[in-house]
Amino acid sequence: MKARPALNTTGGKGGVKGDFHIHTYYSDGVFSPEKIVDLSLEAGLQVIALTDHDNVLSYDVATEYLKTKNVDFTVIRGIEVNTLYKDYEVHILGYFPDVTKSDFKNLLKIQQHARIKQTKEILHLLAKKEGIKIAFDDVKNMVAEGGSIGRPHIAKAITNAGGTSSVMEAYSKYIHRASPVYVERKTVTPFDAVEVIYDSGGIPVIAHPYDIDIAEKL
């Protein structure tokens, strides 16, 4: 779990301590949902939101595990949708979505398809232009079953294949727009994501807005 200050949601000493932006190994996180619950309890948190990139698989795993614990602790279902707007990558957090809604299910399918397509195209170019041969399954197996593959996994696969000496080197050489082997992920707009989250009864929020130059324009 990433180290970040716990949030006191009421502002006073009696407030609820929580972390509302956590990833698991169902996307680019390191830990399982069960481990996240344990670490959160150890940190004295009372509520967390699991917001993996483009999937909601960790929530059911975490809540099932929580049933084995005799604790007052809340797990919120969430998601972080990767979107594109005018060549900017904008991440939209969604809290409390009804995942049974057809539009929400379709959004997940679109996002997963885009991730798979991007990964396969980058791997093809790595082999063709750089001689770095990586099987798609080598990337896919880096996330939990059904999880979201992405750039961190591609970078790690490049390093594992001997293409670079470190993951950071893989990023600096290959995983950026100026790289001859990089392919942009064709994904939905932030407006699409917000609409689907709203329509599914969820609450949309721009993730890390201070890192986005155009956040105020959205």
Tell me the role of every PLM-derived stretch.
Residues 12, 98, 167-169:
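Short, flexible segments with low predicted structural confidence
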Residues 1-88, 173-180, 188-218:
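An N-terminally biased module of ancient metal coordination in phosphate/nucleic-acid-related enzymes
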Residues 45, 131-132, 163, 202:
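Short aromatic/hydrophobic-glycine micro-motifs
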Residues 35, 46, 53-117, 121, ...:
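Mid-domain alpha/beta scaffold segments of enzyme catalytic cores
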Residues 121-125, 157, 192, 196:
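Amphipathic alpha-helical segments that form well-ordered structural scaffolds
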